[in-house]
């Protein structure tokens, strides 16, 4: 009974597979044949210039500069054929100066420095032609000002003309800035100060002139500072440097405090032995192996002298115990 069921199942499966195979081999009447290409499309493609098509069967009948993008799409072959003579006339026409167009058909009638960006866009050829005399007049102006994307002019440059410290909104404001006597006075002053974008002057440089530690708003704020003293960002002076002048251990607020500290340093230099000080004024009166770290810090000179005397006594006792083993075990120092 089981064998009959297995045979019946195998036959049923074979029948179903043969039915599906025959159904796939029959032609599908609902499938539409691909329409043949129209003669006009073939004729346009065979002629020149060739036109690229997109996924909607639109044709590009006007390319942008360098063929990087399409400025105009044509819906059919008739419109593309009509656009070809128009494109040929535009190429043959000599325009001076030549303006680049964007994807909306606008023309650039005002370039920024180095032609890196456009500062003015014209909607049509008439507006572009009207902008040509204006651009010629601007080119003949002296001095020459660089414009940004908002049409402002730079009437005050920083050191080396690397950045602009003052922007003028129009030609009148720029002309007034040129006639300012302050600009010529600044050029003749010494020492020369670098200015930032707010017109402030640097009257205090950090180590190696890598950064400014004090900015002056006007000539009255500029105070002559000795070259060997480097003011901090709060107007304080460093009157005690750390090793290698890598950091400041003590800041002085005025000249009197600095003179007092110098007198204290001269007095400490005459003392023997010389102790190293930290940023809190403490002295190291006990060094570790190789003087790599300090084992004990003393608050005053008296404490340092007492510790030194005790250290010398302990060293003598250690030498005596080592020289005479009969005196017992060596005490720990």
UniProtKB/Swiss-Prot annotation:
Signal peptide interval: 1-23
Composition bias, Basic and acidic residues: 29-43
Region (Disordered) residue spans: 23-52
Tagged with keyword Disulfide bond: yes
Record flagged with keyword Disulfide bond: yes
Compartments where found: Secreted
An individual GO BP term: defense response to bacterium
Alphabetically ordered keywords of this record: Antibiotic, Antimicrobial, Cleavage on pair of basic residues, Disulfide bond, Fungicide, Plant defense, Pyrrolidone carboxylic acid, Repeat, Secreted, Signal
Propeptide stretches in the record: 24-54, 75-102, 123-148, 169-196, 217-232, 253-278, 299-333
Post-translational modification, as annotated: The N-terminal of all peptides are blocked.
Annotated positions of the Pyrrolidone carboxylic acid modification: 55, 103, 149, 197, 233, 279
Any one GO CC term of the record: extracellular region
Bridged cysteine pairs (disulfide): 60-70, 61-74, 108-118, 109-122, 154-164, 155-168, 202-212, 203-216, 238-248, 239-252, 284-294, 285-298
Role summary: Plays a role in the defense of the germinating seed against microorganisms, by inhibiting the growth of a range of filamentous fungi and bacteria, especially Gram-positive bacteria. Not cytotoxic for cultured human cells and are the smallest known plant-derived antimicrobial peptides. Peptide IB-AMP4 has a higher antifungal activity than IB-AMP1.
Free-text comment on this protein's domains from its UniProt entry: Contains repeated alternating basic mature peptide and acidic propeptide domains.
Protein name, per record: Antimicrobial peptides
Organism in which the protein naturally occurs: Impatiens balsamina
GN (gene name): AMP
């Amino acid at each position: 009974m089981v064998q009959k069921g297995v045979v019946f199942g195998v036959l049923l499966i074979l029948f179903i597979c043969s039915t599906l195979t025959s159904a796939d081999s029959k032609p599908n009447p609902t499938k539409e044949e691909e329409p043949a290409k129209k003669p006009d499309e073939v004729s346009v493609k065979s002629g020149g210039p060739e036109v690229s098509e997109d996924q909607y069967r639109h044709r590009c009948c006007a390319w942008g500069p360098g063929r990087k993008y399409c400025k105009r799409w044509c819906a059919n072959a008739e419109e593309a054929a009509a656009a070809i003579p128009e494109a040929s006339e535009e190429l043959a026409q000599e325009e001076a100066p030549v303006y680049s167009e964007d994807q909306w058909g606008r023309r650039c009638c005002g370039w920024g420095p180095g032609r890196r960006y456009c500062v003015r866009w014209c909607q049509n050829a008439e507006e572009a032609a009207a902008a040509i005399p204006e651009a010629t007049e601007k080119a003949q102006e002296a001095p020459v000002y660089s414009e940004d994307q908002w049409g402002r002019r730079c009437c005050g440059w920083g050191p080396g003309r690397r950045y602009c410290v003052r922007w003028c909104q129009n030609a009148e404001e720029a002309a007034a800035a040129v006639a300012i006597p302050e600009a010529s006075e600044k050029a003749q002053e010494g020492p020369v100060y670098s200015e930032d974008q707010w017109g402030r002057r640097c009257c205090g440089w950090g180590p190696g002139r890598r950064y400014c530690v004090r900015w002056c708003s006007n000539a009255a704020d500029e105070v002559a500072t000795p070259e060997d003293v480097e003011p901090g960002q709060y107007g304080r002076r460093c009157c005690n440097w750390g090793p290698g002048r890598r950091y400041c251990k003590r800041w002085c607020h005025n000249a009197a405090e600095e003179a007092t500290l110098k007198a204290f340093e001269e007095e400490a230099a005459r003392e023997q032995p010389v102790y190293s000080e930290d940023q809190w004024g403490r002295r190291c009166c006990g060094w570790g192996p190789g003087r790599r770290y300090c084992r004990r810090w003393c608050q005053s000179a008296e404490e340092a002298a007492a510790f030194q005397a005790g250290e010398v006594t302990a060293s003598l006792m250690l030498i005596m115990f080592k020289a005479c083993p009969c005196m017992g075990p060596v005490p720990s120092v």
